[in-house]
């Protein structure tokens, strides 16, 4: 603990997982669960979420892309939040499919809060006139990706988007995933 800056410096043993280390490649997000006593680190470069013991900071497990995960999203966890029973809510870098929700065991549950793509009236008009071949050549309209995620005390999931053209920048999702 640094009494001047009021920060707690944590030393994490690096190295391979087989040797008991935590091979961080480029961590971007962190979340601590007091309820579960675990520290979660989102590392898009390693394409994993590392779960550490909250007291010893020893690696407990790592979670890669779940085998049952649907969609095209490359599993590059960028931001992370964890609820009281251990469900993980992960913002995946460059994902347009929503927030990835994992079960406490690391299995894929669903995409939460799919953001809707913005198409202006002119684009909509031209798409309606285009042939199938022309539509293939047009740029796809992707939903804005989320930039952060957190939970409130009632279990609602909050997310933000950095899309400057979007009217909605902060989202609050209920258990069904509705804003």
Language model feature labels by segment:
Residues 1-179:
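Eukaryotic scaffold repeat domains enriched in small/polar residues
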């Amino acid at each position: 603990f640094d009494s001047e800056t009021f920060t707690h410096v944590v030393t994490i043993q690096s190295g391979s997982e087989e040797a008991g280390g935590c091979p961080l490649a480029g961590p971007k997000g962190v979340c601590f669960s007091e309820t579960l006593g675990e520290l979660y680190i989102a590392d898009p470069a390693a394409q994993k979420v590392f779960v550490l013991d909250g007291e010893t900071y020893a690696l407990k497990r790592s979670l890669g892309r779940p085998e049952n995960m649907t969609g095209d999203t490359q599993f590059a966890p960028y931001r992370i939040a964890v609820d009281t029973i251990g469900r993980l809510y992960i913002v995946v870098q460059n994902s347009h499919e929503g927030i990835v929700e994992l079960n406490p065991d690391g299995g894929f549950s669903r995409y939460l809060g799919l953001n809707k793509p913005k198409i202006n009236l002119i684009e909509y008009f031209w798409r309606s006139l285009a042939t199938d071949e022309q539509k293939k050549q047009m740029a796809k309209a992707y939903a804005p990706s989320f930039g952060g995620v957190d939970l409130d005390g009632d279990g609602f999931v909050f997310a933000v988007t950095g899309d400057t053209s979007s009217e909605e920048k902060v989202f609050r999702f209920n258990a069904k995933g509705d804003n």
